[in-house]
Amino acid sequence: MPEVIIVKDQDEAGELYARCVADLIKGKPDAVLGLATGSSPLAAYRHLAAMVKAEDIDVSKVRGFALDEYIGLPLTHPESYHSTIHRTVVEPLGLDPEKVHVPGDVLDGAPLEDGERIAHAGPEYDAAIEAAGGIDVQILGIGT
């Protein structure tokens, strides 16, 4: 049975998650992280960035895959999940941007009418995750 840990607030939950991820990266330098956007994981990302810096954790081989992306929104748009992940995770942690992906990598602003391209995006993304060895740990949010 999984262990259930009750914490007092979102910040403490973020710190606990960050510790688990930091320990994972120390033991598996090429860890594959499943990344989420939104407000729920921000404390975790903030604590993880602090741990990476304070403990001099090498993140040069860490890979990441975001949960989702908007269809029809260019990756460079400030509200895209690509931009959000880079702003909240890649830059603060010092991850290699070439090793962090969103489903939209293969779409990059494709219009909704581009059904064939969109239809191939999911299987291509799944194949990229599989080629990376699967997700080692996934962060999710439940909304606030």
Locations of the language-model features?
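Short glycine-rich anion-binding loops that position phosphate/pyrophosphate groups of nucleotides
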Residues: S39-S40, Y70, I142-T144
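N-terminal glycine-/serine-/threonine-rich phosphate-binding loop
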Residues: M1-L33, V100, A119, E124
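Redox-cofactor binding/interface segments in oxidoreductases and associated redox assembly factors
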Residues: L35, Q138-L140
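Ligand-binding beta-strand-loop-alpha-helix segment within the catalytic cores
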Residues: M1, I57-V137
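Glycine-rich N-terminal segment of FAD-binding domains in flavoprotein oxidoreductases
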Residues: G27-A54
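Generic structural signal for well-ordered alpha-helical scaffold segments
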Residues: A18-K26, A49, K53, H86-V90, ...
